[in-house]
Design a protein with these regions (language model features):
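Short beta-strand/loop motif that positions the catalytic acidic residue
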Residues: 228-229, 234-237, 241
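C-terminal catalytic histidine-bearing segment of alpha/beta-hydrolase fold enzymes
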Residues: 250-298
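Conserved alpha/beta-hydrolase
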Residues: 93-115
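Single conserved hydrophobic/aromatic residue that forms the stacking wall/gate
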Residues: 1-7, 11-12
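N-terminal cap/lid segment of alpha/beta-hydrolase-fold proteins
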Residues: 31-69
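Hydrolase active-site cap/lid region
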Residues: 163-214
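The serine-hydrolase catalytic nucleophile loop
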Residues: 80-95, 108, 247-248
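Alpha/beta-hydrolase active-site loop
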Residues: 121-142
Length: 298
């Protein structure tokens, strides 16, 4: 069973992902197996190591890249078993920074070098409070108004971004890449992908409820959309992903329409999971930058 989906006995790291990325920094990172082209034009020399404390005492390890305190500021959120060292967030940070944005990215709890709280992720139930803490940090430490803040997430980070309005609407726009939309379906599909029967989700769910006192489906992306201020969404989806199936994006688009939320959608028949920024970097950057500039007022 995937450690990333149901937890592990150590902090959540897929060594095949984490170890090759562990030396990445905003000013020098590789794309690893994601792509073979040179990303050096997206390196950011001027960045700050930061620590952000959540309401429940978790310390989040992050990097902050600032152009101008009055500029649009985007929070970048990584995927499960990944970290702020991932090119999924560093490449996008470089794209945005070079276009004049500020950018904050951090390790979710139990990921990277943030506090190893309980060696498990909580399907976003706790991680949304990490996002809230990062928004509060930008306000309190960097004097960034919420009117200038947007969110970007890839995969698990995208799902958490969709869930965030259930506890705070202090941001103006959200960009998501290959987001899961229904966690229960995601786990069942992952179990099948790994060669296990899908019904094993039920004991996993009850284990978390009984032993960790966490309801893994208490807050869902749909709940986040329902509670939102109808912040506009830009949605990117590689339809060939074997892990987060294309129906999750179908469901997201339908839910956003039902709630009257404006969406921009780019779907790619030829791409797999979180590949768009590597396969079509110029197109991706242009769409992302124009979206945030159109929906966040500096």
């Amino acid at each position: 069973i995937s450690k990333g989906l149901v937890g592990s006995e150590m902090c959540i790291r897929d060594s095949s992902i984490y170890e090759p990325e562990a030396n990445n920094t905003p000013d020098n990172f590789s794309l690893g197996e994601k792509a073979s082209w040179d990303p050096s034009k997206y390196f950011v020399d001027d960045y700050e190591d930061v620590e952000i404390q959540t309401e429940d005492g978790v310390i989040l390890s992050g990097w902050y890249m600032e152009n101008d305190p009055s500029a649009i500021t985007i929070i970048g959120m990584h995927g499960v078993t990944s970290s702020k060292f991932s090119p999924d967030v560093l490449l996008v940070g470089g794209m945005l920074y070079k276009q004049g944005f500020n950018y904050l990215t951090f390790d979710f709890r139990d990921h990277g070098t943030s506090t190893c709280e309980d060696s498990r992720h909580s399907a976003g139930q706790k991680e949304i409070y990490d996002v809230k803490a990062s928004i509060d940090w930008l306000q309190n430490e960097k004097n960034i108004p919420t009117s200038n803040i947007g969110l970007y997430g890839a995969s698990f980070g995208a799902m958490i971004g969709l869930m965030t309005p259930a506890i705070t609407n202090d941001f103006q726009a959200l960009a998501v890449v290959d987001s899961p939309f229904d966690f229960a379906s995601l786990v069942r599909e992952e179990l099948v992908y790994q060669g296990f029967p899908g019904f094993l989700f039920e004991p996993v769910y009850h284990y978390a409820l009984i032993f960790d006192q966490i309801n893994l489906t208490e807050i869902s992306p749909d709940d986040g959309l329902a509670a939102s201020n109808k912040q506009p969404l830009i949605i990117f989806n590689g339809k060939q992903s074997p892990r987060v199936l294309a129906h999750h994006t179908d469901d997201l688009i339908n839910a956003a329409e039902n709630y009257g939320i404006s969406t921009e959608v780019s779907r790619y028949d030829d791409l797999s999971h979180t590949e768009v920024m590597y396969a079509y970097p110029v197109e991706f950057e242009l769409k992302l930058v124009n979206f945030f500039r159109s929906n966040i007022n500096e």
